[in-house]
Amino acid sequence: GVTLPPFDAKATGAEPRVPAIHFGTILTGDTFLNCEETRERLHREFGGALAIEMEGAAVAQVAERYGIPGLVVRSLSDLAGAESHMDFASFCGAAAEGAAVLIRRLVAVV
């Protein structure tokens, strides 16, 4: 398994915590989503997707076009339509550090 570095209290807006790693379906599209009702509806309609985001659509489109595998690694700070209690600048640094750990592990086995 992979253990990610913990987010500090400033990044989480609460207690320090170690991020969890999830594998599964992520919904992606070209529209910014900031509506809890829509997020919940999409979650129901698409079988419990783990997240909704925008950037992965471009990754998937390019991978499909060139016939290569694609992978999206996300660090999620909040739920669409919910108020975030995280400090965005602190979260970015912590998320980047965690992503680097994960990508190094992935590259080592590819």
Q: What is the predicted function of each stretch?
A:
Residues 1-110:
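Glycine-rich phosphate- or other oxyanion-binding loops that anchor nucleotides, phosphorylated ligands
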